Amino acid sequence: MILITYDVSTETREGRRRLRRVAKTCLNYGQRVQKSVFECQVNSMEMASLKDQLLKEIDLLKDSLRIYRIIEPLEKNREEFGNRLAIDFESALIV
């Protein structure tokens, strides 16, 4: 699992567009846990693709992007509080 955090400058119209594109890219790989924070369950190939896509979107002079690798098992390394608990991607999903 990885944790993605970003800060995109939204002072211009182009910055606001970048922000939407970065968020949409992250949503394709995981779940939003805060406004600019995503948890993503990805393998190494997906990680490389996601990183490439994000680096194409952000402006390295105006924005910041951080990617953290989270040590498994998550149930021992994560505590959650509040009304928006994480989705367990490993368990069965009933639709």
Describe the residue ranges of each PLM region:
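Extended, hydrophobic alpha-helical segments
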Residues: M1-V33, V37, Q41, M45-E46
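A short acidic (Asp/Glu
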Residues: E14, L50, R78
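Short, intrinsically disordered low-complexity segments
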Residues: Q34-S64, R69-I71
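C-terminal structural segments of small proteins and small subunits
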Residues: I58-V95
